[in-house]
Design a protein with these regions (language model features):
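Residue-level detector of beta-strand structural context in well-folded domains
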Residues: 2-3, 27-29, 149, 154-155, ...
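Conserved beta-strand hairpin/beta-sheet module of binuclear metal-dependent hydrolase folds
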Residues: 4-60, 179-190
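Short Pro/Gly-enriched beta-strand edge/turn motifs at strand-loop
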Residues: 9-16, 135-140, 160-162
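Active-site metal-binding loops of divalent metal-dependent hydrolases
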Residues: 17, 42-44, 75, 97-99, ...
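Metallo-beta-lactamase
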Residues: 37, 44-46, 137-142, 156, ...
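Active-site HxH/HxHxD metal-binding segment of metal-dependent hydrolases
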Residues: 48-49, 58-157
Length: 229
């Protein structure tokens, strides 16, 4: 399902259903420009999500090629799962390097092993640990071998004919980044700010005091002029 949410620039929301998941769906956003396009987040790395996203892009007459860029807001599989689809066709991919490194580390199991060791130290029952690591975040993650253009807090990107500001908001993940269009006052919040549920704040072995960092990130964007989020 596609919905236009803003005109000049033309911004669309593609609903990507997440089968067998309590989150139900992901909103993938598309800025369609005259000389290029920007896709923000993808859905899981599974056929149903790929089909929904590709159908939406096809309806918008957007082809996966070098003039279409992909911005991954953070590493979670419902946002990054289909990054390989874009990278394989020459689309530039943008992502914060901290979250990208987590994806790389997860391939050899070191990310999950560090979390498992931490749970064991804290006394979590082994059966519960096993349940934690059989979730979809692991099953439907992307292959991390893709070229990435690293972005950092305060970076200004010119994509799809728009000037976008990168705002690093650690908390939900260490490298989560929002995108802001200052001229239009449009704010892509990703999972930093949700509307009817609260973001999950978990333990990260490379980021101490995740909840404190999240609250600081909320304060960081509190006074941002926003007409549409």
């Amino acid at each position: 399902m596609i919905q236009q949410v803003h005109s000049h620039p033309d911004i669309y929301r593609i609903r990507v259903d997440l089968p067998d998941n309590s989150l139900q769906y992901l909103n993938s956003y598309v800025i369609k420009g005259v000389s290029g396009n920007l896709v923000i987040d993808t859905g899981f790395n599974r056929p149903e999500c790929k089909r929904a996203l590709c159908q939406g892009l096809q309806e918008l007459d957007i082809r996966l090629q070098s003039d279409t860029s992909l911005f991954i807001t953070h590493l979670h599989a419902d946002h990054s799962g289909l990054v390989g689809l874009f990278a394989a066709t020459g689309c530039p991919v943008y992502m914060h390097p901290v979250d990208y490194q987590y994806l790389v580390d997860s391939e050899d199991g070191s990310t999950w092993k560090a979390a498992e060791d931490n749970f064991m130290r804290e006394g979590m029952p082994p059966a519960e640990i096993k349940t934690q690591f059989s979730n979809q975040a692991r099953t439907f993650s992307p292959d991390p071998h893709f070229p990435v253009n690293p972005v950092h807090d305060g970076d200004c990107l010119h994509l799809a004919g728009c000037d976008l500001q990168v705002i690093h908001t650690p908390g939900h993940t260490p490298g989560l980044c929002c995108l802001y269009l200052p001229k239009e006052e449009v704010f892509f919040t990703s999972d930093h700010i949700l509307f009817n549920i609260t973001p999950n704040i978990q333990v990260w072995y490379h980021m101490k005091q995740a909840l404190q960092r999240y609250l600081e990130s909320l304060q960081k964007v509190r006074e941002l002029p926003v007409r549409l989020a």
